[in-house]
Amino acid sequence: MRVWRVTRRAHAAPDGEGARLYGGRWNLLNTPVVYASASLSLAVLEYLVHVDRDLAPSDLVSIAATIPVSLLVETIETGLLPKGWQAPSDQESLQRLGSEWVRAQTSAVLRVPSALIPVEFNYLLNPAHSDFRRIIWADPVPFSLDPRFLQ
């Protein structure tokens, strides 16, 4: 299975450091996790919702990763999430879910619904899990946002 990331070149390393420093929808502060998406287009959308249109970086890269089919992928089903889980203001329950998954070390990959497009999926990758090393990362490729995204 192939997953994608879009990020600034300086943050291309799949170490979960950005998520550890700032937290995210699915992780609390001090919990390293690598965020990826099921498609490059979803990765772009997930990136765009966090960028200031006036400060869009020019050093973006896309990075593909291949998750071996033999690797366990756990899933959080949309129907099991609390009401309002997509709201940007109420992420604590999701952060606890994701952080507990990281701590439990039950798998290196967790499939979660996208808050932007709930029928599509993002993937949390646990860099502390022993199977994380089996994920194969392609080299970062320069990526430019179409200027229409920033209008």
Residue spans for each PLM region:
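NAD-dependent ADP-ribosyltransferases
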Residues: 5-7, 14-27, 34
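Short, well-structured hydrophobic secondary-structure segments
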Residues: 28-76
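Active-site and NAD+-binding cores of ADP-ribose-processing enzymes
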Residues: 2-15, 56-151
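Small-side-chain structural scaffolding
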Residues: 18, 36-37, 43, 98, ...
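Short, solvent-exposed amphipathic alpha-helical segments in soluble enzyme
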Residues: 21-23, 48-53, 126-128
